Amino acid sequence: MKRIVSAALVAVAALVASPASFAAVPEKGSIAIFAGIGPAIPFEGDYEVGFHLEAGGEYYLSNVLALRGTLGLTRSNADGGSGVTLGGLEASAAYYARRGKWSPYVLGGVGIHTVDPPGRGASQRLSAHVGGGTEYYLDRRTALTGEVIGRFVGSAGGRTSSFASLAVGIKYHF
């Protein structure tokens, strides 16, 4: 048993500790594209947990600071069988703290969402969002991503449309 634990610790250490040259270090002016999917957790009790899809791109102002544009689609059912659909366009600033294969980050920004609540017509709402996540580099250009973002959209149709998204995805650096 002691041998198995030691072997497992060595394997984990080998995966986590990698040469810094293995992971991509974006330079000023480089770009990346990404896509993600995961649950959307509404802040309002009348909505159920839904799903969130997103795709976008980043432009690096330096090796640790990027501007991000994101297109998103969120769908959640409500009590009574109908649901809410949100489509959004967001602009963010992201700060990365690179650590070998791992690259944790924080981000924040603003956006505009089209909200189509149950029983009402669609309307546009300004929003703010904050969150963070991490990237795990598979090679110099490709990374798996995981993030949690709180999106504060406001009310539409008498209910708040704000939610938290947990997304896993992939990112490719050019």
For the regions a language model picked out, list residue spans one by one:
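Outer-membrane beta-barrel domain signature
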Residues: 24, 41-46, 78-83, 117-123, ...
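Transmembrane beta-strand segments of Gram-negative outer membrane beta-barrel proteins
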Residues: 25-41, 104-106
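Gram-negative (and chloroplast) outer-membrane scaffold detector with strong preference
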Residues: 51-131, 136-145, 166-174
